[in-house]
């Protein structure tokens, strides 16, 4: 624990979908390790509650309420985080919508909204943060991916978005590596997600 505190102290960590689920767990975990947490969510109630909890425990965090499915919202987040903290060391793409709607019952709006948030949002965040990290010469981007195919309750749009996010992760890793930016995917299981993320980052830091 102490070794990790030294590794992650003062690191600026931007987490999308930080208001609930794995995003909330990771925001709290990074704050406990001394990181500066930039917590994004579309719900001001959820994300501001997370930030209050972190600050109450002596951590440092700030809420950023924007819709990451829209480019203007993404750019607002990046600009504000850069103004507040000066850089972004780690980006975690967690924001996702998860409608359990059968293919034959899903309307076009739901289809587009799922892909816009789960896939396009991750693309926009990766692109915008990646440009900042390129200037910095380093950074880590982690995409949390649900292994949706194994769960028959997920809808077609969600499964398509997770498959697309896996492909985006692989290609982003190839393109961004020359700029000192590492891109990974981590299985999104709330019980173990924090340990998986920290184990990955521990290994990544040892290899540098």
Labelled PLM ranges:
Residues 44-45, 65-77, 108:
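The beta1-alpha1 cofactor-binding region of Rossmann-like NAD(H)/NADP(H)-dependent oxidoreductases
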Residues 8-37:
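Canonical Rossmann dinucleotide-binding motif of NAD(H)/NADP(H)-dependent dehydrogenases/reductases
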Residues 30, 87, 141, 166, ...:
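Conserved Rossmann-fold SDR core element
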Residues 142-164, 169-170, 174-177:
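Catalytic loop of short-chain dehydrogenase/reductase
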Residues 11, 59-60, 87-88, 133-146, ...:
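Active-site loop of short-chain dehydrogenase/reductase
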Residues 102-103, 110-115:
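Substrate-binding pocket helix/loop in short-chain dehydrogenase/reductase
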Residues 126-127, 170:
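A short, exposed helix-loop element centered on a Lys and neighboring polar residues
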């Amino acid at each position: 624990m102490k070794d990790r505190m030294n590794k992650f102290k003062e690191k600026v960590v931007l987490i999308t979908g930080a208001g609930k689920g794995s995003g909330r767990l990771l925001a709290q975990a990074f704050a406990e390790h001394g990181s500066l947490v930039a917590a994004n969510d579309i719900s001001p109630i959820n994300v501001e509650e997370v930030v209050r909890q972190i600050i109450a425990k002596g951590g440092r965090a700030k809420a950023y309420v924007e819709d990451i499915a829209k480019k203007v919202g993404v750019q607002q987040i990046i600009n504000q985080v850069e103004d507040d903290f000066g850089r972004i060391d780690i980006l975690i793409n967690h924001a996702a919508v998860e409608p359990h709607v059968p293919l034959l019952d899903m309307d076009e709006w739901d289809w587009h909204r799922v892909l816009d948030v789960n896939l396009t949002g991750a693309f926009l965040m990766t692109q915008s943060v990646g440009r900042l990290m390129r200037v910095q010469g380093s950074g880590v981007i982690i995409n949390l991916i649900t292994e949706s195919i194994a769960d028959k309750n997920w809808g077609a749009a969600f499964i398509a978005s997770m498959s697309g996010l896996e492909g985006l992760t692989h290609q982003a890793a190839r393109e961004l590596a020359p700029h000192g930016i590492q891109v990974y995917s981590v299985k999104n299981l709330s019980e173990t997600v924090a340990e998986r993320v920290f184990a990955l980052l521990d290994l990544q830091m040892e290899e540098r």
